[in-house]
Amino acid sequence: MSPALVLDTGALIALDRNDRATWALLRVAADDSAIMQVPAGVIAQGWRDGARQVLLSRALRHCDEAPLDGQTARVAGLLLGKSRTTDVIDATVALTANALNRTVDTVILTSDPGDIKLLAEALGSPIRVETV
């Protein structure tokens, strides 16, 4: 069984640019019916023109969107303070993965492993991070 995947903006950009390795990870996860989530803020960072982002649109059809509500925003802010990092969207990626990791092995696909690892450490979470 494939681990659950949480995608950050770097992963969306890689998919949009038709990065074969990132697509392979997504295909394996989809074939295994693994959970795949993308925080809403990540979509906002990566989405520019749906008519031109056909590959990204196709990839997002396989993913569930994790909403960014007020409660999540507050917890993300606390996490940023604890981790001494500044990217709100990275914090929501870490929080999404942390929530999934309670029930299923979870991997974050990111182009920014440094900050993501700091956030995971601040959560005390054994989330795996894979660079794309």
Model-derived features: positions:
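Acidic, metal-associated active-site segment
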Residues: 46, 87-107, 111
